[in-house]
Amino acid sequence: MGSIKGRFAVFANFDYRAGAPPAVSFGNRGGCPTIKQRAQSFVSEFQFGGEFVWWPSPELIAKSNLQQFINKHGLGSYDELMTRSTTDIAWFWNSVLQDLDIQFHKPYSRVVDLSKGKPWAKWCADGQMNIVHNMLDKYAGTPTDNNPAIKSETENGTVSLLTYKELREQVDRMANSLRSLGLGKGHAIGVFMPMVPEIVVAMLAIIKIGAIFLPLFSGFGAAAIASRLNDADAKALFTAAGTYRRGKFCAMKLIADEAAAQIPTLQHVVVLNQASEWLIEDLRRDAKPPATLSGPFDDSPTERTSAEDPMMIIYTSGTTGRPKGAVHTHCGFPIKSAQDMWQGLDLHADETLFWMTDMGWMMGPWEVFGTLLLGATMMLYDGAPDFPEPDRVWSLVDRHKVTALGVSPTLIRALRRYGDEIVHRHDLSSLRKFASTGEPWNPEPWTWLFQNVGRGKLPIINYSGGTEISGGILMGNVLTPMKPCAFSGPLPGMAADVVDENGNSVRGQVGELVIREPWIGMTRGFWKDPDRYIQTYWSRFPDVWVHGDWAAVDNDGLWYILGRSDDTIKVAGKRVGPAEVESVLVAHSQVSEAAAVGIPDPIKGEALVCFCVLKKDVNGDPSLATELKASVARDLGKALAPKEIIFVGDIPKTRNAKVMRRIVRAAYLGEKLGDTSALENPASLDDIKRAAG
C-alpha cells in the first residue's frame, strides 16, 4: 500500500458548539498533526498520506488473533469484519464471548437489550456470571494453573511471581476473610494500595464475593479518598503501610486513617503491613484491636452474580462537584478489556504484558482483567520509571522477558532525554510490540521509540478510549501497515465516526469523535447520577455518544486523535490545539516535554504560554526562548507565536502521564486549582507559580 499525496484546502474557522477544531496537516511530519497558516484567511492545507513505516509480515498476519477470528467466522476481509461488527452488534459480541470462552452459571437469553434506548443498553440479559470464575476458577486442573499469572518488582528490587494456582488460593483465602467480616454482594470496597501482587488479590477477592471494587489512585490524599468512598457508601477499605518513590517511603496507612475518619459507612480497614502480612481493623464501636487475617485456606465459592450486577466503580477526575463514578458490570469492562488485548494488541497466552500504570486509572484494572481472561501474564512494577537509574524500564523488560510494553508519550519523552546508550545496554529481544495510550503522540518521540528502541521492527499499537469506554475506541492492530502517530482505526465492534457540527460524517477535515452504536464495555452510567451521564455523552446528537476528542481520518483510512475538544485555544480568532503547538516545541533538539495553554489577552482574546522541560544538561536562556517562539511562528503562523516560553523542571501530570493543562493554566494565572487529587508531581507547580510572579 503506497502513500497518497492528496491535498485539501479547508477553512479552519468552524463554529462548533463545543469550540471549533484545530487546523491540522498530515504528511510533512510523518503522519502527525501540525498546523499551517495560509495567507491572511488562515486556510489550512490538509496533507494526507504520510509515509508508512511498518508492515506486518505474512507470518504475523496468519498467526494473529484478529486474522484467526476473521477466518473462523467466514469473513472475507478486515473491512468486512468492521462492517458486520458495527451493524450486527449482537452477532459480534456473542462471537467474542464464545471465542474467549466466557462461561456463565446461567446462559443469557439475549445478547443485548435496547428496550430503554442506546444509552441504557443491557447486555447478556438474564445471564448469571461472575467474572472471577473466568479469570481463575476455570483454570483449576488445567495447564494454565501452573503458568505465571503475575510477575512483579518493586523499586527496591524485590521480585516475586504468582502462578494462576497460587493467585487463586490467595484470592480464596481473602474472600473467606471478607465474608467472615459480613461483607458480600453489593457492598462497595475501596482499594488504596501500591502496584504489588496483593492489590490484585484484593481486587479479585472483592469481585469474587459479589462486592463492588473501587480502585483508588495510590497518590490520592485523604479528601479525595473520602469523597469517593462516601459517594459509594463504602463498607471497607484495603490499604498498605506505604510504598517507596525515588527511595523515599510514602506512608499510605496514615492517609487512609485520615480518610476513614470522614467515612461514616466504613466498618473495616484491611492493611498490608511492611512485613507483607494482612491485618484487619474493625472501625465499629467497641471493636477489638487489629488482628491478622484469619480466613481459612479452603476453597471459597464464587458468588453467583447477574452478568449485569455492578462489579466496579471507577471515579474519573473532575474540577467541581461530586466525583463521577463510572459503573461497570461483570460482562462489561472485563470483556472489553480482553477483546482489546486479544484483537488489538494481539496478546497471546504465552506473553507477558507490562504497562506502567496505577490501579486507580482504568489501565490498571484493564491489565488485570485482560491478561487473566486470556491466560497470559501481567508484569507489575511499583516505583519510579527512572530510579535508581534512568534505564529502569528497559532493565525490567530485560529481566522479566516482557513481550508487550505499554507506555505513554509523556513517559517516552522523559526517557528519551537520557539517550540511546541506556537502552542498548539491555537485551530487549523478548519484545514483540509496543502499545501506547494516554494522550496524542508528537512525531519525534514516536520515531525515537520506533527506530532507537524497536530498531524499526516492532509495531507501536496506538490506543485511545477512556474509563467510560472500558478501553479503546481507536487502536492499532497487526494486520494493517502503520504510520507514525496514527491508529489503524476503530476497534471491531466500535461504530466510531468523525462528524461536523451537525453530526454528519466528514473525512479530510477535523471533527468530533463519536460512537453511533452501543458496545459491551460501555459504562452503565454514573453512580447515582443518571442525568449527568446523559448530559456528558448523549445530549448533543440523538442516540450518538460524543466523546470529547478531535479526530481525523486520512486518505489511507488511518485515524488520528488531536486532543480534547475542550482544550482548544483561540488566538485572535484562530483556533489551535495544544498538541500541535507542543509538537513543534518537542521537535527542537533541546526540548524534552512541553505544555501549551491559552491565557486571557485583552487584544487577542487568548495568548499562548508554553512551558518546556529541557533535555539533560541544557540550560534555558532568553535566546533559546526566542528561538522556540520563532519555531512556532514559522510552523504555525505568526499570529500563533507564543507570548511566553517558560522553562520548568517538570510539567504537572497524572500517574498515567496525562498532562494536566487545566492545572498548569490555573497555577500560572493564580486561580484556584480545583481538583488536584490526580496530580502525580505537585512540586512541578512551583516553577509555574514562580514564573507567574
Regions found by a protein language model. Give the residues of each.
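Conserved AMP-binding/adenylation subdomain of ANL enzymes
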Residues: P334-T352, M362-A404, Y418
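Conserved AMP-binding/adenylate-forming core of the ANL superfamily
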Residues: E80-R84, V132, N146, I150-L204, ...
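Conserved pre-ATP/AMP-binding loop-to-beta segment of ANL
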Residues: N146-P148, V271, R284-A287, T292-Y315, ...
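Structural core segment of the AMP-binding/adenylate-forming
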Residues: L204, K208-P290, S408
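AMP-binding/adenylate-forming catalytic core of the ANL superfamily
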Residues: L216-G242, D398, L405, E517-W519, ...
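Adenylate-forming
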Residues: P194, A236-I255, S276, D382-D386, ...
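AMP-dependent adenylate-forming
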Residues: L66-Q67, N71-H73, M135-T163, N273, ...
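Conserved AMP-binding/adenylate-forming
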Residues: Y381, D398, R432-F434, P440-L558, ...
